[in-house]
Regions:
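Elongated, amphipathic alpha-helical interaction scaffolds
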Residues: 1-183
Length: 183
């Protein structure tokens, strides 16, 4: 398996549940405060066809005091990947396939996509794009939180993450990873 240095760096920094909580508090303020009991989950998964694959990072957590079980998938992309929604759906299906063997429900999955590539992000964060409102209630949806580092100023990153210096430097490093290449 070919692992890029920035993949290892990203996983090392963001494998800490406290940092995942901070990410949610910053980038998903509307639900961040309701999430607790974040725990890392094994990222090795098998599809129904017994194909093995690895997720970037995966955590279980609870929302408020309910028994609801949410898993959080973090993906980071250094380039625009038009197939990302398909990949997220595939990962979600594999997680549900495994979970339903032990639980009697399909837990919600929060997908977080880190983007620090060179181009503008132009993939909708809610898919499919449905123009007919009657059709909308019959259509499966995929939503994900996009953290587009190109759209966040260094000052905002510093002010939001100053309480965790490792996270601050990790995000700034990911944001500026291509700067020296361009210069």
């Amino acid at each position: 398996m070919d692992i890029q240095p920035h993949d290892s760096f990203f996983k090392q920094i963001f494998s800490d549940p406290k940092r995942v909580k901070l990410l949610l508090d910053i980038f998903a303020k509307d639900i961040g405060q309701d999430i607790h009991s974040i725990k890392p989950v094994n990222t090795e998964k098998f599809s129904s066809k017994s194909q093995k694959f690895m997720l970037d990072l995966l955590f279980s957590c609870k929302v408020e005091d309910q028994d609801a079980y949410i898993r959080i998938v973090l993906e980071h992309k250094s380039y625009l990947d038009k197939e990302l929604p398909i990949q997220l759906l595939y990962y979600n299906a594999a997680i549900w396939e495994e979970t339903i063997k032990e639980k009697e429900y399909y837990p919600p999955i929060i997908n977080i996509v880190f983007y620090h590539g060179k181009g503008d992000w132009n993939i909708p964060t809610s898919l499919p794009v449905v123009k007919n409102t009657k059709l909308e209630k019959y259509t499966s949806k995929l939503n994900y939180i996009l953290i587009d580092l190109n759209k966040i100023s260094d000052e905002d990153i510093i002010s939001e993450t100053h309480q965790d210096i490792c996270m601050l430097w990790a995000i700034l490093t990911m944001k500026h990873i291509f700067d020296s290449i361009e210069s």
